[in-house]
């Protein structure tokens, strides 16, 4: 943290230029590149030369380097509307520690950020994050993501307590007895998920690794549980970590096998060359994402209990058995100031309406856009959900009745017993629309947008979303 403070002061005040914020962003980015190139002295020398040129603060030169590093120019008044209300650091499934995450957010020009932790947050992690954000002038919130059973699956909420004057006030809140009790329950939920991941690791060793070794004609090392947990480190064990670790252990053998095949292809028959080319393509495609989708996702392993399906077994933590309204009532009692955001992945407008009704105004925000979920095709009902949100906020009884009657007609046409039960519930809501609207007359149902970035995958966009109208003309033209 001290190094971060010194770094910010140096880059903002070393250049005698009115273009100091953008100059500082480029200087830190070049420093990162110098560190990454520590094994390549020639590249480092070139980067040091670039660094010296940028310290002049020449706007034309700085803009060139912004473009080189895929950074948008930000206004020197530093009043841009740039946000990301859903990112992860290394204490969950992200790659960067809290200090690194905040530094990168500043480089990207992000002013408002919410870092999401699963089930609990360690005080040391919260302290580092909040102090780093204070140093860099980034407005940060800490959100805790909880999963709760709803109609044979889990829905996710992000609870972000607010109203703290400084980092110490938030840390004092974490030390209060009710919060300690919640964090302890959260740790149980995370350990429950870890057991599911470790069971999948054992299945990989017993089933998937031998099959993959036979297919690719390479040795596929078995994964050691202790080594895997050491690889996860301070993070919370996840299927993403498992996929990355499996890929890491495979990579050396893949590279060696590809080299051997390329040498063999030089003297092979045309038929064998075709087989070799196909095998190399298969190896090239074996990314972390492919390993996850093909072998590690719960639906790919039906012989194991799925952590994505609610279970009332005695060993299931209480936190994962609470209905949504019970969990949210608990959270809302812990702090008078809070935001509770409903995540919309795989939810329909009917699901959202029912949750809003059940939770009686405790849901304050909808995560209307999540870049990761959108890329994966999990946000198919955003238009209908947005229409519902607008109708609730406008206070239009006629509009809400129209939406509800359309839902009821669809449910009436279904032969499912669950749809009939939901239809009866929606008729009750139809007769009590003012009760649905009442909590949102004072504080409208708002939205949150985020990327769900973990800084891991090269096939996904990084963190940060910007309102183009708040950016300089050159950046808008570039977009």
Give residue ranges: language-model regions.
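Charged catalytic cores and adjacent phosphate/nucleic-acid-binding surfaces used
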Residues: 1-112, 121-182, 188, 261-265, ...
């Amino acid at each position: 943290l001290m190094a971060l403070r010194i770094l910010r002061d140096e880059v903002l005040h070393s250049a005698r230029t009115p273009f100091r914020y953008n100059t500082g962003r480029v200087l830190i980015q070049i420093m990162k590149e110098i560190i990454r190139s520590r094994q390549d002295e020639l590249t480092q020398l070139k980067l040091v030369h670039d660094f010296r040129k940028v310290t002049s603060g020449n706007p034309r030169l700085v803009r060139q380097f912004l473009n080189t590093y895929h950074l948008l120019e930000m206004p020197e008044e530093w009043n841009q509307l740039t946000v990301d209300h859903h990112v992860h650091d290394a204490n969950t499934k992200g790659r960067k520690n809290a200090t690194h995450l905040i530094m990168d957010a500043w480089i990207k020009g992000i002013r408002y950020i919410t870092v999401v932790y699963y089930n609990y947050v360690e005080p040391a992690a919260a302290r580092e994050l909040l102090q780093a954000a204070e140093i860099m002038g980034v407005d940060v919130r800490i959100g805790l993501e909880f999963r709760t059973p709803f109609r044979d699956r889990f829905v996710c909420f992000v609870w972000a307590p607010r109203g703290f004057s400084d980092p110490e006030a938030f840390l004092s809140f974490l030390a209060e007895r009710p919060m300690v009790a919640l964090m302890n329950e959260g740790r149980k939920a995370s350990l429950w998920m870890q057991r599911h991941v470790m069971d999948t690791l054992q299945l990989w060793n017993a089933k998937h690794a031998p099959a993959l070794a036979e297919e690719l004609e390479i040795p596929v090392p078995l994964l050691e549980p202790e080594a895997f947990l050491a690889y996860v480190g301070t993070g919370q064990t996840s299927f993403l970590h498992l996929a990355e670790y499996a890929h890491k252990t495979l990579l050396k053998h893949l590279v060696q096998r590809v080299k051997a095949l390329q040498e063999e292809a030089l003297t092979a028959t045309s038929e064998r060359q075709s087989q070799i080319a196909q095998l190399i393509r298969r190896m090239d495609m074996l990314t972390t994402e492919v390993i996850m989708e093909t072998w590690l996702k719960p639906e790919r392993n039906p012989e194991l209990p799925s952590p994505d399906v609610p279970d009332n077994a005695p060993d299931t933590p209480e936190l994962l058995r609470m209905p949504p309204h019970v969990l949210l009532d608990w959270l809302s009692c812990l702090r008078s100031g809070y935001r509770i955001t409903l995540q919309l992945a795989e939810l329909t407008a009917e699901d959202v309406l029912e949750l809003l009704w059940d939770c009686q105004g405790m849901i304050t925000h909808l995560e209307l856009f999540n870049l990761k979920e959108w890329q994966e095709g999990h946000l198919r009902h955003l238009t209908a959900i947005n229409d519902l949100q607008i109708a609730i906020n406008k206070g239009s009884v006629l509009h809400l009745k129209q939406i509800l009657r359309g839902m009821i007609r669809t449910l009436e046409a279904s032969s499912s017993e669950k749809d009939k039960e939901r239809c009866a519930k929606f008729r009750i809501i139809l007769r009590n629309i003012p009760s649905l609207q009442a909590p949102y007359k004072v504080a409208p149902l708002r939205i949150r947008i985020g990327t769900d970035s973990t800084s891991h995958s090269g096939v996904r966009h990084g963190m940060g979303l910007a309102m183009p109208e708040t950016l300089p003309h050159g950046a808008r033209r570039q977009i």
